[in-house]
Swiss-Prot record:
Belongs to the bacterial ribosomal protein bL21 family. Keywords: Ribonucleoprotein, Ribosomal protein, RNA-binding, rRNA-binding. The keyword Nucleotide-binding does not apply. PROSITE patterns: RIBOSOMAL_L21 (PS01169). GO terms for molecular function: rRNA binding; structural constituent of ribosome. The gene is rplU. InterPro entries: bL21-like, bL21-like_sf, Ribosomal_bL21, Ribosomal_bL21_CS. GO terms for biological process: translation. This is Large ribosomal subunit protein bL21. This protein binds to 23S rRNA in the presence of protein L20. It comes from Streptomyces coelicolor (strain ATCC BAA-471 / A3(2) / M145). GO terms for cellular component: cytoplasm; ribonucleoprotein complex; ribosome. Part of the 50S ribosomal subunit. Contacts protein L20. The lineage of its organism: Bacteria, Bacillati, Actinomycetota, Actinomycetes, Kitasatosporales. Pfam families: Ribosomal_L21p.
Amino acid sequence: MYAIVRSGGRQHKVAVGDIVEVDKISTGKVGDTVELSTLLVVDGDAVTSDPWVLAGIKVQAEIVDHHKGQKIDILRYKNKTGYRRRQGHRQQYTAIKVTEIPAAAK
C-alpha cells in the first residue's frame, strides 16, 4: 500500500515506514505527529483518487529531524564591466517518517 501526498507544494510517493524529506514544517518539533493531505491511495489493485473519499483520509507521519540541505551558489556576472555578485542559499528541510496510511472506505 502506498499513497501520493502533498507537502510544501510538492508531491511525494510514500509507504508506511518511509522517511521522506519535505520542505521545513515550522510548526512542529521533533517527535510531533503531522497529517499530510492525500492525493491518491493505492492498495493492491484498488486505486482511490476520488477527492470526496480522499478528503477524509490523512496520512500520519512523525517528525524525525530538521536540517539544512546542500549549499548552492548563485553567481551573476556581466562581461567587461567588473560586475559580479555572489549569493548562497541552503534550503531548510524536515525529515518525516510515515506511520500510518488509512485504508479508503469501500
